Curated annotation (Swiss-Prot):
A GO CC term assigned to this protein in UniProt: cytoplasm
Compartment(s) where it occurs, according to its Swiss-Prot or TrEMBL record: Cytoplasm
Listed HAMAP family: TorD
Record protein name field: Chaperone protein TorD
Native organism: Actinobacillus pleuropneumoniae serotype 3 (strain JL03)
Length: 199
């Protein structure tokens, strides 16, 4: 049964907000400390119950390994840049435009523009964040859940707006050579969660 039917809206919101917080920008010191201090232990157990035990174990192992670094946060910041901020041949750019052809992208962004207008979501021009950034999609999905849009609408958004390109992004992220596998694991976990959310 899909998460959208199995889980409460609050549980799904927590999950998608968590993914958004990890992928929107480099982790802050408080974010990393919370992860390492076990503040998300119950959440990790929750993910494991949903069938993501391998990813949870890998993530916990990576968090443990970070303690060996003099500056774990800076190490993760470097990994974030390596995974997502360099040019396309070197990074897994988190933009739909990098993976969709012109026609599919045009259709995808037309739907996105409708939802952005409906929810009055403003793109962060200060950081030059295009509307096809992964985290903008997650913001719209969060709004769909918050405003209690029909489950079919939420699932259609995931299927058509995200899963048309996210598997390629996650696959490319998995191929990036970085100091840790933190973001590779998070990307794989997000993809798996989205796929379960519509099945």
């Amino acid at each position: 049964m899909a998460h959208s039917q199995l889980l409460s809206s609050e549980e799904r919101l927590f999950c998608y907000r968590w993914f958004h917080s990890l992928l929107a920008k480099e982790l802050s010191e408080p974010q990393l400390q919370a992860l390492q201090a076990g503040q998300f232990a119950s959440f990790f157990a929750f993910l494991a119950e949903l069938g993501f035990q391998p990813q949870v174990t890998d993530l916990q192992n990576e968090l443990a390994k970070l303690t060996a670094y003099d500056s774990p946060r800076l190490e993760l910041a470097a990994d974030f840049a390596q995974c997502f901020l360099l040019e396309g041949k070197l990074s897994a750019l988190p933009y739909a435009s990098y993976y969709l052809d012109e026609r599919d992208l045009s259709e995808n962004l037309a739907v996105m523009d409708q939802w952005l207008t409906k929810f009055q979501l403003k793109i962060n021009r200060l950081h030059n964040e295009p509307s096809d950034h992964l985290c903008i999609y997650l913001e719209v999905l969060i709004k769909l859940i918050e405003t209690e849009q029909p489950v079919q609408v939420q699932q259609q958004f995931i299927r058509q707006q995200l899963l048309g390109w996210l598997p390629q992004w996650a696959e490319k992220t998995a191929q990036i050579h970085s100091s840790t596998a933190f973001y590779q694991i998070i990307s794989n976990l997000l993809l798996g969660f989205l796929q379960q959310d519509i099945t």
